[in-house]
Amino acid sequence: PKRLALISSKGTLDWAYPPFILGSAAGAMGWEVGIFFTFYGLTLLKPQLTAAVSPLGNPAMPMKMPFGPEGFQNINWAMPNLLMANVPGFESLATNLMKQTFHNKGVATIEELREACLDMGVRLIGCQMTMDVFGFKQEDFIPQAEIGGAATFLEYAADADVQLFI
């Protein structure tokens, strides 16, 4: 079978989707898949996922409403960074709006995608160096998470047909 090697380095909600979507899609196609979670991506291996999204500093992020009349939902709400940085709770609002929009569109949650990956035998490899730097222990993560260093991932990735850094 083909082999996919992914590196997941970010733990925000918007960056949590790509490795799990690609991993589960490749797994469903019968590919071998390994995802190496390093730096902030390592938090995606925790039992309770708390990934949030911040539109601050992300001008490409559309702010659309997941409710209301269709015309209202289709408005691109341009929010200046100054407003987003100074309004308490704005990150929480953006996170909830994104989750609701994904739900309305039938997109699986991060938890569901991670579970699908596990069901298909996708290897979820946590970076040992990142664990050491941030003070994590193996018991901080889901039991299915493998722990390995860069060499562990490179050995896997060397034989991969597709390698992506996300």
Feature roles, as predicted:
Residues 6-16, 45:
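Short, glycine-rich nucleotide/cofactor-binding loops
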Residues 33-39, 125-128:
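Short internal beta-strands
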Residues 16-30, 35:
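Histidine-anchored nucleotide/phosphate-binding helix
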Residues 53-93, 106:
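A glycine-rich helix N-cap at a beta->alpha junction
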Residues 126, 139-166:
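Glycine-rich, aromatic-bearing surface loops/beta-hairpins
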